[in-house]
């Protein structure tokens, strides 16, 4: 699948993206709210997990590109959120591209695709409660906090969600999407 927004292209990740993804997932500042940054083997597993999800589900975390350059990942994955497997919108953007709206734009596109192409009744984002940039991105895309809980692996987590009806009422074409 390929998703085009006004500034970004989201596409399936390949092994050719390893170096660019490793630069993001191994960076201590970027991965501050994860248990630890990823090593090379972990990044290879990440890419394989994404590719397996494309084959099994038709969705996953896609490579986010700006003018052909890999700047992060964003997409839909099924995650165990407080004991339930739910469709989650997740994102990681290279830190030299933070605060430019790319995470919000990519996430908005993925929310639209989750509702329009995959028919999910609601989508979720969850993150460490201290990860303010991430929960602000969720809120910018119309999500509201619906839960909070402590997880042995990630600590205290906030859960945000938006259902399809709410999304349709507030949907704008700020981030027009063309998915192929």
Regions found by a protein language model. Give the residues of each.
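Conserved GNAT-fold acetyl-CoA-binding loop/helix
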Residues: 29-49
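Acyl-donor (CoA/ACP) binding surface of acyl/acetyltransferases
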Residues: 1-32, 61-180
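A short helix-loop-beta-strand connector motif used in the catalytic cores of GNAT acetyltransferases and
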Residues: 50-63
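Short, P/G- and charge-enriched loop/turn segments at secondary-structure junctions
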Residues: 49-51, 147-148
